[in-house]
């Protein structure tokens, strides 16, 4: 299997005891499975919950605190316990754990966004395991991600992950909460998430979790909109994540089956994404895109119209004004205007992902081939 970029999110209930407090056996089981995925050559980014659940006991609370200050204080205690446990467990497999604590405003600022991307990329290049949680102790309630399910979907989208795996205490999505309705039936595969499913999904099932299945479905829908397929479920043992990636997991698969994920992203670009602008390319770039399977580079761009942002979808037209394809851009319109016609190495500083391509091959869909300019 080709190298995959996988975002794994682990919920509080899968890391702590029902009454709170870190469960080292549960945590080790996940670490072993992540280490195995890395040994198979995949990139893994971990989104971990559990700071509040791990910290409230040691801080002296009998149950998960309900006040914001209580949760924030518990998270400050629990986060360091979590990282201590991850660092020592990953070290047993020869991997280094790296902590990143995010707030929603990190996603609003392009500069922070860019730094975050560069940091995670550098960590992955060096073989480390990026471990992300919300920076609970400083997050302001109105500005939180909602929960780590949504955070994991946003991270999976912006890292162009191949798959988002939401590990939880239940083996998938049911048509009703199985903890309260024993007749509930499990979905094995869903092509999409409908409003009805979100309505039907219930809330939290454990004393330590946050959003329940509803928040997972909202997150799954967000991930699908970025072209990332999702798995919600459970598992145990070293091979559980590899099995999930191979389509053999105990849970619900949402979107296109993982190996065919690229196809889905392209479908989204071709048929669903709003088109935010237009780029004109010269005949060399047109030929590279249509005949040689290459990415679009800044050097081949001759004109830019519309007010698009980086990662928006734009139409690409040739010198005759004929639309030849559509793709997701790494540059905002204003930046692309500055760098059109320039060498990639000069231009890439303006791309928020530091990527030289204007449209990477993976984010390109050909709409007309017969129109190549002569
Ligand atoms: N339709 C549903 N299908 C499956 N689980 C559901 C459903 N509705 C509610 N749940 C509950 O969601 C829980 C998982 O959510 P949560 O406790 O937030 O987990 P985590 O801590 O892993 O994020 C399950 O234990 C289950 O009780
Ligand atoms: N950031 C919080 C987790 C919030 C959260 O979404 O929890 P969960 O529903 O268990 O994934 C913490 O570390 O306690």
UniProtKB/Swiss-Prot annotation:
> Where found?
Cytoplasm
Q: Which reaction does it catalyse?
A: L-glutamate + ATP = L-glutamyl 5-phosphate + ADP
InterPro entries reported for this sequence: AceGlu_kinase-like_sf, Asp/Glu/Uridylate_kinase, G5K_ProB, Glu/AcGlu_kinase, Glu_5kinase, Glu_5kinase/COase_Synthase, Glutamate_5-kinase_CS, PUA
Question: What keywords are assigned to this protein?
Answer: Amino-acid biosynthesis, ATP-binding, Cytoplasm, Kinase, Nucleotide-binding, Proline biosynthesis, Transferase
Any one Gene Ontology cellular component term annotated for this protein: cytosol
Keyword ATP-binding included in the entry's annotation: yes
- Which EC number(s) does UniProt give? 2.7.2.11
**A Pfam family name for this chain?**
PUA
* Family listed: Belongs to the glutamate 5-kinase family.
What task does this protein carry out?
A: Catalyzes the transfer of a phosphate group to glutamate to form L-glutamate 5-phosphate.
Q: Know the name of this protein? A: Glutamate 5-kinase
Which organism is the protein's source? Geobacillus kaustophilus (strain HTA426)
